């Protein structure tokens, strides 16, 4: 029992899900999803704070990629009025866009996981990793990027394993 009820692993175990690997564990008290794997049943689960964990099959994974510096576009063609409105609406976003323009800084980094929904359409689950400017030449950037790439590799390996199972291992 944790401070706020059952632990995530206990909630998952109650649903027949056995955590064999934590692909990504979000920092405590954040609104970021955690992702767990059950290799035995070829399932994975997403847990968001305050919600019941959602269990998915490997075959539900459509794609996974790391997205960097996705923000508003501050370009030279922007009128002064448009730029002024952008600054008023979100000054931090404009500052980050300018910092990331030359490629020297990473201003945001997200792992974007595309998953098959109940209706068969894809929906995107984002895991934000970087929210402030980080110099691309820094060790911190390299650690974040390596971690993001590892999460994507693990998720895509699950998808590929499901594809092999459907095609009979060919």
Language model segments and positions:
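Short coil-to-beta-strand transition motifs
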Residues: 52-63
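Anionic N-terminal interaction surfaces
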Residues: 1-54
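Acidic, Ser/Thr- and proline-rich intrinsically disordered linker/docking segments
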Residues: 64-170
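Functionally constrained cores in energy, signaling, and assembly domains
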Residues: 37, 56, 73-76
């Amino acid at each position: 029992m944790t401070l706020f009820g059952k632990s995530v692993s206990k909630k998952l175990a109650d649903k027949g899900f056995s955590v064999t690997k934590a692909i990504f564990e979000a920092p405590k008290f954040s609104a970021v999803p955690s992702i767990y794997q059950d290799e035995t049943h070829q399932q994975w689960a997403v847990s968001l704070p305050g919600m019941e964990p959602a269990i998915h099959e490997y075959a539900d994974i459509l794609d996974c990629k790391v997205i960097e510096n996705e923000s508003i576009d501050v370009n030279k063609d922007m009128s002064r009025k448009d730029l002024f409105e952008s600054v008023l609406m979100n000054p931090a976003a404009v500052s980050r866009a300018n910092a990331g323009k030359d490629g020297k800084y990473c201003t945001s980094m997200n792992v974007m996981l595309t998953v098959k929904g109940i209706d068969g359409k894809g929906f995107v689950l984002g895991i934000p990793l970087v929210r402030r400017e980080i110099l691309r030449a820094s060790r911190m950037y390299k650690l974040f990027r390596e971690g993001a790439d590892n999460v994507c590799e693990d998720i895509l390996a699950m998808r590929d394993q499901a594809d092999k199972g459907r095609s009979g291992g060919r």
